Swiss-Prot record:
Name under which the protein is recorded: Serine/threonine transporter SstT
Any one GO biological process: serine transport
Gene encoding the protein: sstT
Keywords recorded for this protein, A-Z: Amino-acid transport, Cell inner membrane, Cell membrane, Membrane, Symport, Transmembrane, Transmembrane helix, Transport
Membrane-spanning segments: 12-32, 42-62, 81-101, 141-161, 179-199, 218-238, 245-267, 288-308, 330-350
One GO cellular component term noted in the UniProt record for this chain: plasma membrane
Compartments reported by the entry: Cell inner membrane
Cross-referenced Pfam families: SDF
Membrane-topology descriptor: Multi-pass membrane protein
Function of the protein: Involved in the import of serine and threonine into the cell, with the concomitant import of sodium (symport system).
SUPFAM superfamilies assigned to the protein according to its UniProt record, in alphabetical order: Proton glutamate symport protein
């Protein structure tokens, strides 16, 4: 009986389960403060599990990605689209930073009063702080959640191991798969954690806490739409000197629509390949560029990482300098490139960006947990942007005469 319940839950739709968790959390939060405090234990356990697995995930994910990927035999077109993917992701990240400056959002969180809200403001202090974090002991970086140190050692390890044997690389691939399975298990428990977090938030802050979540979601979605219709349109126009919107709407209709519901760039690869074939793009090109885009073209993820990191900074009262904003855009770009193929990958990389501002690790993980709450919509829009941009950039880099008459 009990095993059947577990199997039924494991096979259930995560979105539906999260929605049920949110609804029950609101009801409990309104009806009973005592029960909400008990339910909050589930939220604490969930955020603790995320805190435990996130450093190892970032380290293994980035190390394995650098160690195993080989672009040495890529042609000029592939090199061009790699550059375009990274540039597009950077512009999306920079756009998210600007959006947060114009429309800052503050979250209502417990324990913000005790958070570390001091951040270096002078350029020399910023670089000194960054350097000390970068050269941190790797074991200490993993245990303390120093994500800049983790990122540094992961990149260094990936480069150092790039020329090791295929058998050694397979070991890291297997370890990576094992860590991803643990992450998948933790994310599958999200409905319980979200239930506890929402119940406690409603009981402690009332509608004010939920309203801040809605504001954050609106900012995220609006920024992603701006990237879709303005940033991407400008990139296409400057690259082709043609009206970008016919191609953009084809990509939205035939790629973004499906990606919105699958919530997976990898799962949308066959859809994107079929669309590229209809557009008349060379198979030899899109056969490489589309799977590659599903791996490193993460404009939506960059938006999520940048906005949620700055929201965490706003919440604890940290003033962000222009230099820090620029560094955040770079960090969010490369962090987003490592977020592919991971359930909630962009959310789990938020502490990496938060470490730039000396934001308390507990506060960063509370923001991650809120990201899972709004992720019902955020993740769908993020994936739609990521996946449709794969086809968009593939089309303009292909140099083929495109077929716009697609039904």
């Amino acid at each position: 009986m009990f095993s059947k319940i577990i199997q039924s839950y494991a096979k259930g739709n995560l979105i539906v389960q999260i929605c049920i968790g949110i609804a029950l959390g609101i009801l409990i939060g309104i009806s009973s403060k005592e029960i909400s405090e008990i339910a909050n234990l589930l939220g604490i356990l969930f955020t603790s599990a995320l805190k435990a697995i996130a450093p190892m995930l970032v380290f293994i994910l980035i190390l394995t990605s650098i160690c195993t990927k080989d672009f040495s035999q890529s042609g000029a077109k592939i090199k061009n689209i790699i550059i375009l993917y990274i540039v597009g992701t950077f512009f999306a990240s920079a756009c998210a930073v600007l959006a947060n400056f114009f429309f800052p959002v503050k979250l209502v969180l417990d324990g913000v009063q005790t958070a570390t809200n001091s951040s270096p403001t002078h350029m020399s202090d910023i670089f000194k702080d960054l350097l000390f974090k970068i050269v941190d002991n790797p074991i200490n970086a993993l245990s303390s959640g120093n994500y800049l140190g983790i990122l540094t050692w992961a990149i260094a390890g990936g480069i150092a191991l790039k020329h090791c044997s295929n058998e050694a690389k397979q070991v890291f691939i297997d370890i990576n798969e094992g860590v991803l399975k643990i992450v998948k298990f933790v994310v599958k428990l999200a409905p319980f954690g979200i239930f506890g977090l929402v119940a406690n938030s409603v009981a402690q802050t009332g509608a004010q806490g939920l309203l801040s979540y809605v504001k954050l979601l609106i900012l995220l979605v609006a920024t992603m739409l701006f990237v879709t219709f303005v940033i991407n349109a400008l990139i296409v126009f400057f690259y082709t000197r043609k009206n970008p919107f016919p191609l953009i709407f084809i990509c939205l209709r035939h790629s973004a629509f499906f990606a919105f519901f699958t919530r997976s760039s990898a799962a949308n690869i066959p859809v994107n390949m079929a669309l590229c074939a209809k557009l008349g793009i060379d198979k030899e090109f899109y056969g490489i560029s589309i799977p590659l885009g599903a791996t490193i073209n993460m404009a939506g993820a960059a938006v999520t990482i940048a906005i949620l990191s700055l929201t965490a900074a706003n919440t604890v009262g940290i003033e962000i300098s222009l230099l820090q904003a620029f560094l955040l855009s770079i960090i969010a770009t490369f962090a987003a490139c490592g977020a592919s193929g991971v359930a909630g990958g962009s959310l789990l990389l938020i502490p990496l960006a938060c470490s730039l501002f000396n934001i308390d690790y507990d506060i960063a993980m509370k923001v991650v947990a809120i990201g899972f709450i709004i992720g019902v919509i955020q993740d769908s829009v993020e994936t739609a942007l990521n996946s449709s941009t794969d086809v968009l950039f593939t089309a303009i880099c292909s140099k083929n005469e495109l077929n716009y008459n697609i039904k």
